[in-house]
């Protein structure tokens, strides 16, 4: 995958580089090579849009967020809250791992199954519920909704 003509490498690829040539990897870190830079929320969301063949306009419609707010997220001007990232996750039908990675990239707390609301959200993600279905379920168990 390319971003600004620079390859974004997976964790597995980086691990292989470390195993095969730790000295070269360490020197690259000193010189600021791109494998040293973590993904940003906009970069990860772009990858997910491509993976799920979804447009930004579809995402706007499904998240019920304003067009300007979504474009500010994609431009890196806005740092979305955990609940906004959840709305995006449900709109894109992400799985739990992709959602957890989105939280990691966005520097938000991971879903934790011992927290009642988080456990409910994980169940909804696992069942691929829509944002509306998730909202209805959360309200039915007296938990804070996403909308």
Language-model features: locations:
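Short, basic-rich loop-to-helix N-cap that marks the start of a DNA-contacting helix
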Residues: 77-91
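Short, charged recognition helix plus adjacent turn
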Residues: 2-15, 100-129
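Short alpha-helical "recognition helix" segments of helix-turn-helix
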Residues: 55-62
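General nucleic-acid-binding
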Residues: 1-34
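Recognition helix of helix-turn-helix/homeodomain-like DNA-binding domains
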Residues: 64-80, 105-107
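The alpha-helix within a helix-turn-helix
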Residues: 49, 60, 89
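A short, Lys/Arg-rich alpha-helix, primarily the initiator
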Residues: 21-55, 134-146
